[in-house]
Amino acid sequence: MKKNTHPEYRQVLFVDSSTGYKFVCGSTYQTDKTEVFEGQEYPVCYVSVSSSSHPFFTGSKKLVDAEGRVDKFLKRYSGIKQSAPKPETVVEDVLPKGKKKSPAKKKK
């Protein structure tokens, strides 16, 4: 088996940057930053969302609109008036008198 083909699997400290929540988990994440947690030094990875801040786990429904896409949409289309629904038109096949539709041909 070849040496040095797989990344090193080790315990890494993950820190939620929005809540400050910290947890240790096995990972191959590569970093030079380290931090002391519960008396041991671990490589550290800063994450923006974890189980302590994600709405699914916290039960809060919060709209995160970092891009402002909803505001742009509302600003662009707020002045447009909704048009009245168009009446449906029925289209019928009109054949000249005396001509009948030919039956569908069967494929062999």
Curated annotation (Swiss-Prot):
Pfam family, one: Ribosomal_L31
Domain of life where this protein originates: Bacteria
The entry's keywords: Ribonucleoprotein, Ribosomal protein
GO annotations of cellular component type: ribonucleoprotein complex; ribosome
Record flagged with keyword Secreted: no
GO BP of this protein: translation
Biased composition (Basic residues): 97-108
InterPro entries: Ribosomal_bL28/bL31-like_sf, Ribosomal_bL31, Ribosomal_bL31_B, Ribosomal_bL31_sf
GO molecular function, one term: structural constituent of ribosome
Region described as Disordered: spans on this chain: 85-108
Family of this protein: Belongs to the bacterial ribosomal protein bL31 family. Type B subfamily.
Xref: NCBIfam families: L31, PRK01678.1
PANTHER family in the record: 50S RIBOSOMAL PROTEIN L31, CHLOROPLASTIC, LARGE RIBOSOMAL SUBUNIT PROTEIN BL31C
Assembly with partners or alone: Part of the 50S ribosomal subunit.
Annotated protein name in UniProt: Large ribosomal subunit protein bL31B
